[in-house]
Amino acid sequence: MDAIARDAGVAVQTVYFTFHTKAEVLIASLELAGGEPDSPAVVMERAWVGLVMEAQTGGRRLALIVEHSNDIYARVGPLLPAVSAASSVDPDVGRAWQGLVARRRAGMGRVIDVFAARGELRDGLDPSLALDLVFGVNRAEIYLAFTVECGWTMERYKAWQFATLAGQLLPPWVAEAALADGSTEVADLSFRNELGLFA
């Protein structure tokens, strides 16, 4: 807290008055890092989530999720070791992190509800299982494993995640069309040129 106050040019008490605990500072840092300039702190209120919710097909909806959520993970990923270390010694940090994770899952649940309501999930796939699949695969820890530990580019990682989730969530013919060369579902997205590796 002393270092934050010093860097901000304010009194330590000002930092404590604003954030109260180190856990609150850490979570605020994650939310700030995850956002874009002038974007709302709450992910579900960001413009790209509106595009996800309004997408006309399940393939496009999934492609937008992969494109934008992983951009967030690229920004917050470097903070995860600090979260892990702080959680092991400060229960407040652990609780705050779990709260953030729970909000992420709830937001993903709202998106899965849209897939289900529009009949975009493959036959027999229960929405709760679909949520587990997205929540398990689309996360910062997996992003770090592939991009840092395996050395993949962001585009390759996004293409893999899209192909993996499309195969698990979408009806086979929808997934096949979304993964096809020249697919309009991904034509304007960063990972389009890497899809051939996983289709």
Predicted feature locations:
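C-terminal peripheral helix-coil segments that are non-catalytic and often amphipathic
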Residues: D71, A106-L121, L131-A199
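Amphipathic alpha-helical packing segments from all-alpha helical-bundle domains
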Residues: L64-S84, P91-R118, S128-D132, T164-G167
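Helix-turn-helix
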Residues: M1-A28
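Hydrophobic alpha-helical connector segments
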Residues: K22-E24, A28-E31, G35-A74, L131
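Phosphate-coordinating loops and pocket residues in cytosolic domains that bind phosphorylated ligands
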Residues: I27, A85, V148
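Helix-loop segments that flank and shape redox-cofactor active sites
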Residues: M1-R6, A85-P91
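Short, hydrophobic secondary-structure boundary micro-motifs
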Residues: P81-V83, R95-A96, D123-G124, A145, ...
